[in-house]
Amino acid sequence: MALAISSEDTQVLLKDKNVLHESNVDKYRTAGQITQTALRFLAGLINDSYHHRTRATPLSVAELCMLTDSFVERCVRQAFANKANERGIAHPTTIDVDEITQGWAPETDDAANMERWNRDRQANSGSCQGARSAISGFLHEGDVVKLTVGCHIDGYTAQVSHTMVVYPTTRREADQALVPAGPLLGAKADAVAAATIAKESVTSLLACAQATEKLPAAFGERQVTGTLIRRVVDAVARSYNCAVVPGSRVRRVRRFLAGQNEGVVAERDIKGVHWTEAHQEAALLASSVETTDVTRVDASNKSANDSAVATDDFVVVSGEAYLIDLKIAPLKDLPRGLLTLQTVDHFSGKSHRKDELLARASLICRDFAKQHVLKLKSSRQLLHKLDSKGVYPTKLAHLTAAFPLDPESPDWDAVSKELKHLRLGLAEVTNNYLANEKPVQLCRLVPWDVILKAVNPTGKHGTDASNPTLPGYEIPLPQLGISSLRLKSLLKDSLPVPVARESITVLLCPAEVTSTGSPELLKLTGGPTTTPSWIHSDYELNVSDPVVQGILQLAELSKDKRFGLAIRETQPWKQKIPSAAAVTSADVEMA
């Protein structure tokens, strides 16, 4: 069932409401301030629990998520109290460890279930220990932790993701303070470095859309296009012996359309660069001599729904908002293979690997295109609460009366008690597709020799309906004829891969809404709160690559305050938050 919207309403919702007036920029800026303040708050809680060790018992991942969401909710309620119809959490706090790519935001009552579901699981001896931290509920030394927070004011969304490292600590002789024992080394450090540099490079590249005459000649382009964005990110990943994980994106965001329902909602006039398995397949075939006669698809044969299919054929223009969300995985000491995502569920008895993680999704998103009369009273009550949360993902804990929690004395028992009642109605709501669960996903590498030896007798059109994909990318490997169901069956021969993630939201502000009277790029998130962790990579940018030469020129332009790129950062609120929020030596400049 699809929503019928008139052309007049479409003009208002997709065009008029997305013009960057001063009032809209203020809402974007406020959402960015709240998001960055919340990220600083979350980083402080982690530092106090796992670095400074000022707490007798460290906070669990579920408690960290809940306290941060409560902090965001309290801040949002203070902003635009009488000027915005809707405001709240746009992305519940997720804390993804190592190979867990996205979606890990456990409820407070999941700890006992995680141990029960995974009691027969065999521990993984490799460097990826995300499953270990997920089952125990606590972070461990050496974990690469991806923190994601987001909020919105009247549908104008700001989101940030930052990769943080949990270091082993030692006492400093001068003052006996706990400090990191040393930088992060190895493959994980390569991924963190590549993600950070790629994020900053794309930010500077988008700023060139405001002044195309400053676009480096090494790129061979006169406009900032989707193709150029992909070339820049791929060049950085190659230099650090890494690859871009499927699900990464640099896309335009609009009011209430921030990419939170990709694969479920076919967004009209979508603009963005998306990385999928099909792009890895194309790169493999392009590097093979035997594939010079690959049939190419004529782009002129467009269907009626092509506006919902994301392609690189677009130009970045002033007056738009963009989400830069990059996930990078290292390839060091790994065979050549395909990076793909594995969806986690809590069903046992499957004939899969013995080290597979079992867990249930926590993020829920209402689908307003579906209507159904529910039978259970608890289901109807839950649906009413979900309707009040709008189109953004939420958690059952956010629907309890105890939310938001008091950070000084949180009532965890009250939340757990209400969760039992809410779970009774969740099954009927999701079974009738009134709400969609956003899955927990792991990054896995399937060797190419396994894929090339696989047969697909059911045909390449056997799609996996349980995992929605972007329109136009239903077949993960179209040229090799591998369907999503067949690729899913090959995951039993895959390897876990750690992931680093960096994401920010930026505005391309026209001259009419800036204080300087000239166009500028406004970083809503990703300012001083996303300082890179202390790492050391064995790789560096390949200066012989023309694209890398352009990237280095972009870096110089971003530093030139007078003649370079006009980039302004949104600062977090200077309000008093717990002392845990101070950034310590665990977040120092990259070595």
Curated annotation (Swiss-Prot):
The places in or outside the cell where this protein is found are: Cytoplasm; Nucleus
Can you provide one Gene Ontology molecular function annotated for this UniProt record?
metal ion binding
Q: Secreted among the record's keywords?
A: no
Question: What is the enzyme's class at the highest EC level?
Answer: hydrolase
Q: Which Gene3D superfamilies match?
A: Creatinase/methionine aminopeptidase superfamily, Winged helix-like DNA-binding domain superfamily/Winged helix DNA-binding domain
Q: Which GO terms describe its cellular component?
A: cytoplasm; nucleolus; nucleoplasm; preribosome, large subunit precursor
**Biological processes, Gene Ontology terms:** proteolysis; ribosomal large subunit export from nucleus
Q: What is its EC number?
A: 3.-.-.-
Q: List keywords of the entry alphabetically.
A: Cytoplasm, Hydrolase, Metal-binding, Metalloprotease, Nucleus, Protease
The keyword Acyltransferase appears for this protein: no
Q: Which residues are listed as membrane-spanning? A: none
Q: Which InterPro entries does the UniProt entry name for this protein?
A: Creatinase/aminopeptidase-like, PA2G4/ARX1, WH-like_DNA-bd_sf
The UniProt function text for this chain reads:
Probable metalloprotease involved in proper assembly of pre-ribosomal particles during the biogenesis of the 60S ribosomal subunit. Accompanies the pre-60S particles to the cytoplasm.
Give the quaternary structure. Component of the nucleoplasmic and cytoplasmic pre-60S ribosomal particles.
Family membership noted in the UniProt record: Belongs to the peptidase M24 family.
Q: Which PANTHER family match?
A: METALLOPROTEASE ARX1-RELATED, PROTEASE FAMILY M24 METHIONYL AMINOPEPTIDASE, AMINOPEPTIDASE P
Q: What is this protein called?
A: Probable metalloprotease ARX1
Kindly list the organism's lineage: Eukaryota, Fungi, Dikarya, Ascomycota, Saccharomycotina
What is the primary gene name for this protein?
ARX1
